[in-house]
Amino acid sequence: YLFSLDVALMFRLQCSKKYIYEESDLVHTYISNRWVQRVFEYIDKKIIKGSVLTVFTSQGFIKYHFKDDTPNNTIVVPNRLTPEILDYSIIPKDAINTSCIKFGFVGAVRFKSLYRLAETILNNFPNHEFHFYGTINSNRDGDFMELDKFQNCYLHGGFKNPQDLPHIYSSIDIVISTYDLVEENVKYAEPNKLYEAIYFETPIVVTTGTYLAEKVNELGIGYDVDAMNEKSVISFVNSLTQESLQKRIDGCKRIDKEKTLNLNKELFERLDNINIKQKNIHSIR
């Protein structure tokens, strides 16, 4: 079982044994030289096609490599919630008050687009609230601490996952999951925040122009916005109504909660089928 492109490449150079490959990041897209990036993309696709099975953590990664021509030896296993979350009861929420919407970010606080979106909301909508749950990255500490000057900004600090998630999501109306589009990887990734939003029936806001935005709109569970564009953010917030928010909440409710959990049933079934086929091949030989 090979994790990441660098490990898989070293393995392929040294032996010809069968392998299962997992890709959770498009690591070669971080290379600034486009020609080198293309070489590694060619190698990556060869490794994928040569595998017994390739496990992707996002359907977007398959789309990046192969457009709509998905190879048969691939499977998508997203970063869903740990089944341990079932040990903690979901806390019922009050109906959303559109005069005082509680926006929330849950996770490592570091992205510039998150700062810009939060600043725009805090500055232009003093009636709404913005809550941060998670530690602030040291590189962005100054920026985000500056937001504390707004009376409608709340920095809650770190939290325990998954123990604290029910309380956190019961305290917010909309969860923010916007990321900087500087890296190609972000455009195609599928963060676990998507599955938290569905599980806790909370509308999600993501970055326009990403695979995540496509999925959120397809499922009808949230909104996409250009977080770096002040006019876009203001227009988005002004467009929020009780009806549109309830429509997204209902979209979350329609999805079976089991599909948000990291149970890996499909993966185990595929692995079992591979083992059966391998045994049949050996018996024929």
Show where each model-derived region lies.
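Acidic anion/phosphate-binding donor-loop and adjacent secondary structure
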Residues: I31-S32, V76, R80-C100, F111-R116
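A charged, aromatic-enriched C-terminal amphipathic alpha-helix characteristic of glycosyltransferases
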Residues: M228-I234, T241-N280
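Membrane-proximal helix-turn-helix segments that form the acceptor-binding/catalytic region
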Residues: D6-Q14, Y21, W35-F56
